[in-house]
Amino acid sequence: MKILVTGYTGQLGFDVIRELKARNIECIGTTRNEFSLTDTEKMQAFVKAYKPDVVIHCAAYTAVDKAEDEVELCDQINHLATKELAKVCKKTDAKMIYISTDYVFAGSGENFYEVNDEKAPQNVYGKSKLDGELAVQEILDKYFIVRISWVFGSNGKNFIKTMLNLAKNHDKLTVVNDQIGSPTYTVDLAKLLCDMALSDKYGIYHATNEGICSWYDFACEIFKQADIKINVKPVPSTAFPTKATRPHNSRMSKKCLDKAGFNRLPAWQDALQELNR
């Protein structure tokens, strides 16, 4: 089996490649230079030449606020490039794993979103990822759509690194407490994605670590595990206005993982502890 991983220098792609190599599965990771999501011909030629059995599509435009001003670029990368990648997967009979997001939902209420609940993205980024999902479903039969949220890992920027860096120069921080969701540890997710790649249990899944929290709760746990004494004050989202609307409710049900026989990811607190080891 051969697996192609897009965006392998990013947070998730980095750990997916590492997990595949640990399992002795032949794989290749793509960079922007050799596999440009804005150059359809180059992208298709790369896939046809490598002939993967599975494409794990981690590469994405993720600058949520910037996307409000770069609508076309965001759509090109998250939607149109995904559509073209799905087409070449269809031609080469490759499975495709598309990484999506909680942002496809409205992000209101307090219930856990099921995979087939109504989609109502509230910003440009969320709409582009939903359009990518729809393209994959329209073109392919052999696909996995995996929705995640609040991603963290050892490679790249994330909330944990931001908090720890801020703590170096501040003795007091304010963190939003009215956005609720679940962190996703890239190492745990990479294991699940590799399990999916080896299966034919196609469909849409939610795959965050177990448990829910607010960003404030997350920050408090980060400092607790790092043994950093700092005053963290909870504040509403209105204290930090952003160009793009953020979901207040990112709770996502993982029933589909259970139904398919996939293991759920460990508790987010345990994942954080694992990262700190």
Which positions does each model-derived feature cover?
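N-terminal Rossmann NAD(P)H-binding glycine-rich loop of SDR-like oxidoreductase domains
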Residues: I3-L20
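Adenosine-cofactor binding site in Rossmann-like domains, unifying the SAM/SAH pocket
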Residues: K21-A45
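NAD(P)H-binding glycine-rich loop region in Rossmannoid oxidoreductase-like domains
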Residues: T40-I77
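Active-site "gating" loop of Rossmann-like NAD(P)-dependent oxidoreductase/epimerase domains
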Residues: Y61-V64, D69, T101-N123
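NAD(P)-cofactor binding segment of oxidoreductase domains
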Residues: D69-I97
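NAD(P)-dependent short-chain dehydrogenase/reductase
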Residues: L134-G181, V187-D188
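Mid/C-terminal beta-alpha module of Rossmann-like enzyme folds, strongest
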Residues: L192, S199-P241, H248
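Conserved C-terminal active-site "lid" loop/helix of NAD(P)H-dependent oxidoreductases
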Residues: S214-Y216, C220, P236-L275
